[in-house]
């Protein structure tokens, strides 16, 4: 995948405010669907749909803990996204 394709994919995933907020909430800690739903004030079904997109983009990891699945941000992927986005946004000159 070229840098341009990576940039487009990243910005497409981040084009929804709820997903941006989910990434912020999942940095440095893990939360289950119900905790995310309560915090974001959306339904668990909506959270699950957003998490599917974030998992497909390889930005979150699911960890089963007992009956619950907890999600967290993949720090190394977030660092890569930061690098790719910065390469687009940096000023030349």
Please annotate each region the language model reported.
Residues 55-63:
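Residue cluster at the C-terminal edge of the helix-turn-helix DNA-binding motif
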Residues 5-45, 65-77:
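N-terminal helix-turn-helix DNA-binding core of bacterial DNA-binding proteins
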Residues 10, 52-53, 73, 86:
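Intrinsic structural disorder/low-complexity segments
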Residues 48-50, 89:
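Short alpha-helical linear motifs
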């Amino acid at each position: 995948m070229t840098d341009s394709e990576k940039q487009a994919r990243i910005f497409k995933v981040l084009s929804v405010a709820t997903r941006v907020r989910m990434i912020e909430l999942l940095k440095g800690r893990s939360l289950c669907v119900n905790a995310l739903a309560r915090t974001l004030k959306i339904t668990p079904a909506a959270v699950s749909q957003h998490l599917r997109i974030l998992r497909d983009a390889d930005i979150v990891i699911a960890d089963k803990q007992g009956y619950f699945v907890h999600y967290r941000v993949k720090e190394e992927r977030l660092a890569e996204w930061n690098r790719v986005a910065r390469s687009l946004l940096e000023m030349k000159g």
